[in-house]
């Protein structure tokens, strides 16, 4: 896990430099056509630098996917976050990931990060030892969440709901309602992943981009499938942190992190589904 953190920190550090270079110091970009997609404007051949206004996407197809990677890798060190004395060897790498997350300007990422940090504060070794300080720690955690909630990025997304046009907020709301309808129609087995009946149902109920991975999985594979995956993730987290409430905080952060993306990005989710011989490599 430390190798993964280290390499992601290196990638994020370079990505931040390239993005700042592009946004403020004139680094150019080349439009790359991709079959079946609209293509991307890439800087230095690898970095997706023009997704939205000054938003960091790194080498990923959009900032929303990048924040999922950042949140899930941060979660590998949640146990250390609960005891700051063990966090020092990883602190500089996690700080780079935090800066990168802020630069994604992702609403889902901000809220997920707020929940992750809130859980770390409330369930920290210091907080559990000094239980009388729990109200103060809870207030501090809520203040962090409120600060992120009132950020320009989040408030702009919320304000979009009042505009009668195709934008991120309205598209995702339409997707959620359509996918929820599909889940309600076939809650146990779903419509099948990638089947014609699933695609027909998405079109019928008004899903534009299938932007909620959890609901999409439930609509295609059935609710029991998604619940089973979430139980496995929770069990894995609890084995690592040994605190049920802390595990719930991190699980909730993971759910929200992926609630605005069309896939559940299992290469990262698998880190919390399967058991590994060691967490160190």
Kindly label every feature range from the protein language model.
Residues 81, 87-91, 114-123, 129-136, ...:
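Hydrophobic transmembrane alpha-helices and their immediate junctions
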Residues 26-55, 195-214:
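Interfacial juxtamembrane loops and adjacent helix segments
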Residues 14-20, 98-102, 140-147, 250-262:
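Aromatic-anchored segments of alpha-helical transmembrane domains
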Residues 151-221:
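Long extracytoplasmic/lumenal interhelical loops at the membrane interface
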Residues 58, 62, 102, 106, ...:
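A conserved mid-to-late transmembrane alpha helix and its immediate loop/hinge
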Residues 6-32, 48-52, 58-105, 110-123:
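Alpha-helical transmembrane segments of multi-pass inner-membrane proteins
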Residues 73, 247-256, 262-281:
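Transmembrane alpha-helices of multi-pass inner-membrane enzymes
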Residues 17, 21-27, 121-163, 182-185:
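A membrane-periplasm/extracellular boundary helix in multi-pass inner-membrane enzymes
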């Amino acid at each position: 896990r430390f190798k993964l953190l280290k390499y992601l920190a290196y990638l994020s550090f370079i990505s931040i430099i390239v993005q700042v270079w592009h946004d403020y110091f004139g680094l150019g970009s080349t439009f790359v056509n991709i079959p079946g997609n609209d293509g991307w404007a890439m800087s230095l051949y690898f970095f997706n630098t023009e997704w939205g206004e000054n938003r960091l996407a790194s080498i990923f197809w959009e900032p929303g996917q990048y924040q999922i990677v950042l949140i899930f890798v941060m979660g590998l060190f949640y146990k250390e976050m609960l005891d700051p004395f063990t966090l020092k060897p990883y602190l500089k790498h996690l700080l780079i990931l935090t800066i990168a997350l802020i630069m994604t300007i992702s609403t889902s990422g901000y809220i997920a990060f707020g929940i992750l940090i809130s859980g770390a504060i409330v369930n920290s070794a210091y907080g559990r030892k000094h239980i009388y300080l729990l109200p103060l720690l809870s207030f501090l955690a809520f203040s962090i969440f409120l600060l992120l909630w009132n950020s320009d990025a989040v408030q702009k997304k919320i304000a979009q709901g009042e505009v009668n046009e195709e934008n991120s907020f309205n598209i995702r709301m339409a997707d959620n309602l359509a996918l929820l309808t599909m889940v309600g129609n076939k809650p146990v087995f779903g419509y099948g992943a990638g089947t014609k009946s699933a695609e027909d149902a998405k079109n019928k109920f008004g899903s534009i981009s299938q932007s909620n991975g959890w609901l999409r999985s439930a609509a295609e594979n059935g609710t029991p499938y998604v619940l089973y995956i979430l139980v496995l993730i929770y069990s894995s987290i609890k084995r690592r942190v040994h605190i049920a409430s802390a595990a719930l905080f991190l699980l909730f952060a993971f759910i929200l992190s992926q609630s605005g993306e069309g896939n559940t990005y299992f290469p990262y989710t698998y880190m919390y589904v399967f058991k590994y011989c060691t967490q160190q490599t």
